Structure formats: structure tokens, C-alpha cells
Swiss-Prot record:
It is found in: Cell membrane. Its main location: membrane. Pfam families: TraB_PrgY_gumN. The keyword S-adenosyl-L-methionine does not apply. Its EC number is 3.4.-.-. Keywords: Cell membrane, Glycoprotein, Hydrolase, Membrane, Metal-binding, Metalloprotease, Protease, Signal, Transmembrane, Transmembrane helix, Wnt signaling pathway. The lineage of its organism: Eukaryota, Metazoa, Chordata, Craniata, Vertebrata. It comes from Danio rerio. This is Metalloprotease TIKI2.
Amino acid sequence: MNCQSGLRWLVTLCAFFQVGSARDTHESTRQCDKPVSQKDMNSFLWTVKRPRPFPPSYLFGTIHVPYTRVWDYIPESSKRAFQTSNSVFFELDLTDPLTISKLTSCQLLPNGENLQTLLPRDLYRRLKRHLDYVKHMMPFWMTADQRGRGLYADYLFNAIAGNWERKRPVWVMLMVNSLTEADVRSRGTPVLDLFLAQEAERLGKQTGAVERVEEQCHPLNGLNFSQVLFALNQTLLQHESLRAGILQGTFTTEDLIAHYNCGDLNSIIFNHDTSQLPHFINSSLPDHERLTAQQIDSYLRQELIYKRNERMARRVSALLQRNPNQSFFFAFGAGHFLGNHSVLDILRQEGYEVEHTPPQEPIIQSWSEREATTLNPTEDSFESVTEWTSETPELEEISQEELSHMLLPDSLSQLEEFGRYKHPRKTHHTHSRPRLFSDLWVRIGDSTTPHPSIRITNGYVTVEPPQIRQEQQQRLRERLKPLSEPTNPSALDSAAPNPTYALTCFLACLISQLLFAS
């Protein structure tokens, strides 16, 4: 289902989700009653049907809120589709610590620069004043449950705003948007995307991503300096107005949760994802500032919606084509499946049969799906993300679309928290075929360098240089030469080769070569 055609991509400046008080957050929003039956639930699941015997795959829309706020409202059909799928793919690989390090480095200013020397003095002072206010308010914003779980205000502040003076201004702007009472109260619980990633890993499913970190980072870093200063200034003005009680947010995180749990798929709020980018267009702006706001909105709409939807749909299609026997579960932000030129639209244009899955519809694991679970991964290997090109054709501007869900810095501390428990890194292969055991023999056979001598004594590994090894072997042969020469013909006849000894020597040589190669 698509958004109503009359919806605009951006709303006015006051259509901003952050609110300055708990009263606005908790009392002015509609709460959902838990549905009585499955058919009363809201389904954000779409099925990609394929001809038999190939199994179906699924597209699931998420929102960036603590999973505990929405999990009980997600239909069993969506949960069943997740459980029966062989592979689960996200926008980014949330289980890979490399994702965290790349997100962090992408946000930092180059060459050791800092905001104090980069920003105009007045703007820097206002920013620091606002962050000092947030740090002061953090203990009062935290919930009793958070304090009971051992979370501290200073820890939360540093998790979100740590090292802020070294970050690029555009990322500081987004950081400011995540330093609100509503967001602080939600910290400590994995958001829905991250929870699904953790569950997929716990269940031993194949996980992956359809985007690279750079593809989400670079468009934001592509704004010019004057545009970034304008955006940061407008963001601070909004929050300063909220603090002063002059401005109140229209769309709140609570509104987003309520619409996800019991709203309808045509709601504007999913494309106005409230945990993400602020909106700057305001009729009260002077003409030159309104033009700057429109340029920023147009740029972000093109880079963060149309190009991403095109890229994500193309990579979903590639995975389905390369792995016809696999059942996939793609969990993306709900905004990517709503509105014009969505991921669903693009897949349908490519010939896929994509249908919305009602909440009461059963998900049955067919024989083909059970068979797919035994496939050799080397036969149906996934296309490496590093092999995908980030170039996408320019899309026509569509005026009736809004910013989609995007994993941005308000989730970075959640990723960092998860990443601390992920010591081993995933192996990133750049080759196009699986490595064979015969490759090892090719490398050994082609080598012209003498191999070192490797010994394991009492659990310790010692390596001797090749030249020393050759000298020792030569001395050993000289000592054994008199013993090996027969003294009479009868001795020569009795010197039959011992097959057990020969096999032992061969195995010892093989093990030493393998140890060297590894």
C-alpha cells in the first residue's frame, strides 16, 4: 500500500517530533490497546512469491524504537516468516563490529579538526550551552527502570554525545536530535532492528546487509559547509524553542509507536520517520533561507530515498536470483515500503509478485523451504556487498515522498553496546569463488623459498630459519650415511623398505608444510 498521493514530502518546521517535557510525550499521544485477535493486528509484512518449487521470501517493515514497545503487536505471521527463513538481511550488518568502527570514523572531522575552530563562535557557544543543558537534565529524564539496571546519566550522555567536538557538524545536528527526553528514556533496550539481528544470530541464521556504511554516510557528508551550518542552526533554534515552551512537537516517538501498532499503512507518519532527519522548510523563513532549505530537502530526498530504494531493491533482486532455493527475510525501515517509488514498486517493475501479507494469514514451511536449509552455502553463495557498485541512475524527482527510515547516529550507541560482545569479526571475502583445498597445494608447490622448520614441543611452537634446517639435514645425512651403506650383498637384500616408516615420514612432512602455509 502506498501513501496518499496528496501527501507532501516535508511538513512545516513545527512538525518535529522531539518534545521538551514528559507531559507532552506521554499525555498528549494516543495509546494502543492490545489487539484481541490476530486479524486486529497491523501487518508490515509483504511476501515475494516465486513459482514452485522455490520458496517465498519476505519483506518486513521496522521502526527505530525499543522492540519491547511493539513486539506484542507484531502478528504471528510476521514472526513465523522470520523463523522459517534461511537468511535475514538488514540495511546494515548490525552484528559486525566493522560496521560500528566504520560508522564512527565516518562521523569524525578530517585531519584532527574540531568544532570549536570550525564553527562560528556564536553557533558553537549555543551548541555547547544546549549540550550542557541536556547533560544537566539527563538524571531527571532517566526512568527508575534504567537506574535499576545500572545505567547512569553520565554513561548515557557519553554514549550519545561522547567526543562531539570531533564530529562533523551534520552528525552533531543528528546527535542533538537524539538528545531528547523521549530518546533518553528509551535507551538500554535494543531497537527493533537490532533485536531481530540478535535473534537471527542466536538462531544460527545467515545474516547480511544490502547496504554499505559508506552509502549511508557519504550523502550526509556531501552537503556543503554553508548548508550544514544552516541545518545545524535551524536544529538548535528548534530545540531552543522547545526548551522555552514556544514550540511543541507535532509528531512524537509515541505517535510513531501508536501508528505502527494500531494505525494504518497509509499514514504520513512512517515517511516522516521521527527518529531521523529534521525538516527545515518553514513559511516564516526569508526567501534566501527558504531556498537553502529546499536545496537541502531536495538533495536528501534524492540521496536518502530514491537512490537508496533503487539500490536496495536491486540488491534484493540479485540475492533472490542468485539463491532461488533460499528463503529470505528482509527487515528494512517501514518507510522504504511506503510511498511512491518504494522498494515494493521497484521489485514489481522488475516482474516480482509482491503481495501484502494479512496478519491472520498462516506462514507454512513448505518442503522446498525445508530442503533449502540443507543447501551447501558454497553452491549458493551470497553476493558480497563489497562487489556491489554504489552508482545508481538519476531518478526523476517525486514531490510526494518523505524521508524514509534510516539507521543514523541515534542508534550508534546501541550498535556499540552490542559490538562490545562481538569479539570475532566476520570474514570479508573479495574473491568470486569458494577457496578450494587444492589452492593450498598450488601455493606450496609453486613456492621456491625453502620452508622453515616448525616444531611443537610441550605446547610451544618454534620456527628455525630455512638455512639452518638445510645444514642440519645435511649433517644428519652424513651421520646416517655409514649406517645406511650395506656391508655385504645379504645385507643389501635384507634392507627392504619399511612402508610404515615411509608413511610416517610423509605425514610428518605434510603436517610441517600445512603448518607453514597456515
